[in-house]
């Protein structure tokens, strides 16, 4: 069988020779172009298994995992199963976005909720996901998630010592949909009394993986996949190429390579090309630049849901200032938007969302397109959060003090002054606030039903001591007033490598790319569609598909 080995974007020009053909890199590029491969990469041609000789590899292991966020779980699983595993990490520290999260996992039908007598079923979970994802619903991927997430939860407990408990605020973000639940599906590690769970899951998995013998190569980005193509067009991954400083390292993966490189929310060009949201800020890892996506595309992988993202609202000033340094915390607006006496308005002076809905739904509300008159663009940008002094005296906003909101806010004596300074339609804003105030006095929001759903009423950040919708509604009547510009913010991009229900990468014809797997924000999975199901809705599918990948890899024989 004639085979083509491709080593993409990796080797020093003119230095590498094929073990079979003696073709230099420069010559191979010319030959590849003549045969229609263009600038895809280097073509090393000949019979047999090019690149399989021991002298052509610097390292040989069973599995290479690219990325140490959710990928660390997969590495733990494969190493524990007796498969030697290397993790390549672009950053100088391990953990990725998982280490920055609250460690919550959305796990329907989990043992803890069932032990408390709460009813749940696979059918209910899939009904909920289908209702929330609409035409993006992928039943095979959704079912794979629900079928395997609890195995991942159990393995985190058994292998990494994670002690799970039901998250007290365990409310499905769209619990009003068919199949939604108001308690039990979201789990988080028990970090101890009064301690934060941020990073606990990641730390536990990383420690266990290192103890098992996983080799972590930090500050060592993967730069290319090594593949070969059979006569029938089937692509098989043989390993990868990494860089450590100026050194190139070629790693043979006898069984598989798993892509877990995160999203592309720190790649402005990719965001502009793919996303259908105006979000251009992220609190994810600054190394999430779409590396895994691009490497997979170069070996023919298809992409899925590239227009989608995990969203939230954020104070623009916070993210403008953190852009170079990388935001390491959730925007404080996520904790502010359910408080009494805050509203969001667009440049037209109109409210455009239920401010205390779940953060992903609020983030998506920025995506409306302007179709009125001659204007085109994003209808709800620029946008502003507005509070009055009564709200400021009752709650802290933007990490400020009682009576004095944080630095994102600017003080104005009147709403008219505020509108002029912010470029908001003045008359429209005055009318909108008047209407909002009238309804708020009665505990009503006929426009967006704010505070009427279970999620809002049980929100950790809504005002205690009030009943029903009044927990989140209060009129804005007490000057001075404060305004802060707000923007949609990415928790991460959702789209990535198209995979099947075994986490195997697929090409543009729907064929399996042998020995290439993907998980997390590098895989186009979401929750089996575009939806933020609830707390832990990103980590849940990430480790579920890590579990799926590890289980499938265990069945593979070595490539020859």
Predicted segments, located by residue:
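N-terminal Rossmann-like FAD-binding beta1-loop-alpha1 element of flavoenzymes
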Residues: 63-86
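An anion/pyrophosphate-binding glycine-rich loop and adjacent beta-alpha core
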Residues: 293, 302-424, 428
């Amino acid at each position: 069988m004639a085979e083509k080995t491709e080593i993409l974007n990796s080797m020093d020009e003119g230095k590498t020779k094929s073990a079979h053909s003696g073709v230099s890199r420069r010559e191979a590029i010319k030959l590849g172009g003549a045969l229609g491969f263009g600038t895809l990469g280097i073509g090393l041609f000949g019979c047999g298994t090019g690149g399989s000789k021991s002298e052509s590899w610097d390292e040989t292991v069973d599995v290479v995992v690219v990325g140490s966020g959710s990928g660390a779980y997969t590495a733990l699983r494969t190493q524990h199963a007796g498969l030697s595993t290397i993790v390549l990490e672009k950053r100088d520290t391990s953990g990725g976005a998982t280490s920055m999260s609250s460690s919550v996992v959305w796990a329907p039908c989990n043992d803890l909720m069932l032990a408390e007598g709460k009813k749940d079923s696979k059918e209910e979970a899939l009904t909920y996901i289908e209702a929330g994802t609409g035409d993006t619903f992928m039943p095979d991927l959704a079912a794979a998630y629900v079928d395997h997430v609890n195995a991942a939860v159990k393995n985190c407990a058994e292998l990494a010592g994670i002690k799970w408990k039901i998250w007290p605020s365990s409310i499905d973000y769209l619990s009003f949909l068919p199949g939604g639940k108001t308690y039990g599906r979201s789990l988080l590690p028990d970090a101890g009394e009064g301690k934060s769970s941020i990073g606990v899951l990641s730390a536990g998995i990383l420690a266990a993986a290192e103890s098992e013998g996983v080799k972590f190569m930090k500050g060592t980005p993967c730069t290319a996949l090594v593949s070969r193509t059979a006569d029938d067009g089937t692509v098989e991954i043989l390993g990868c190429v990494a860089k450590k400083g100026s050194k190139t390292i070629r790693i043979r993966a006898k069984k598989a390579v798993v892509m877990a490189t995160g999203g592309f929310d720190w790649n402005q060009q990719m965001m502009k090309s793919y996303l259908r949201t105006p979000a251009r800020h992220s609190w994810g890892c600054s190394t999430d630049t779409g590396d895994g996506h691009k490497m997979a595309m170069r070996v023919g992988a298809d992409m899925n849901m590239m227009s989608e993202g995990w969203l939230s609202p954020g104070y623009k000033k916070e993210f403008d200032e953190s852009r170079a340094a990388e935001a390491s915390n959730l925007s404080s607006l996520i904790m502010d938007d359910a408080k009494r006496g805050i509203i969001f308005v667009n440049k037209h002076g109109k409210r455009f969302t239920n401010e205390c809905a779940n953060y992903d739904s609020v983030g998506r509300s920025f995506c409306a397109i302007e179709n009125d008159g001659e204007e085109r663009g994003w209808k709800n940008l620029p946008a502003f959060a507005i509070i009055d002094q009564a709200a400021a005296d009752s709650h802290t906003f933007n990490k400020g003090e009682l009576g004095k909101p944080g630095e994102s806010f600017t003080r104005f004596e009147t709403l008219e002054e505020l509108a002029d300074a912010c470029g908001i339609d003045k008359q429209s804003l005055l009318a909108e606030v008047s209407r909002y105030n009238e309804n708020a006095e009665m505990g009503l929001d006929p426009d967006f039903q704010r505070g009427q759903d279970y999620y809002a009423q049980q929100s950790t950040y809504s005002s205690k001591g009030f009943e029903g919708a009044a927990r989140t509604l209060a009129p804005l009547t007490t000057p001075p007033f404060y305004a802060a510009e707000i923007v949609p913010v990415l928790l991460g991009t959702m789209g990535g490598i198209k995979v099947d229900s075994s986490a195997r990468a697929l090409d543009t014809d729907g064929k399996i790319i042998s020995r290439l797997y993907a998980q997390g924000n590098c895989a186009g999975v979401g929750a089996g569609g575009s939806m933020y199901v609830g707390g832990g809705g990103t980590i849940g599918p990430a480790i579920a598909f890590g579990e799926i990948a590890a289980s499938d890899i265990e069945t593979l024989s070595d490539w020859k």
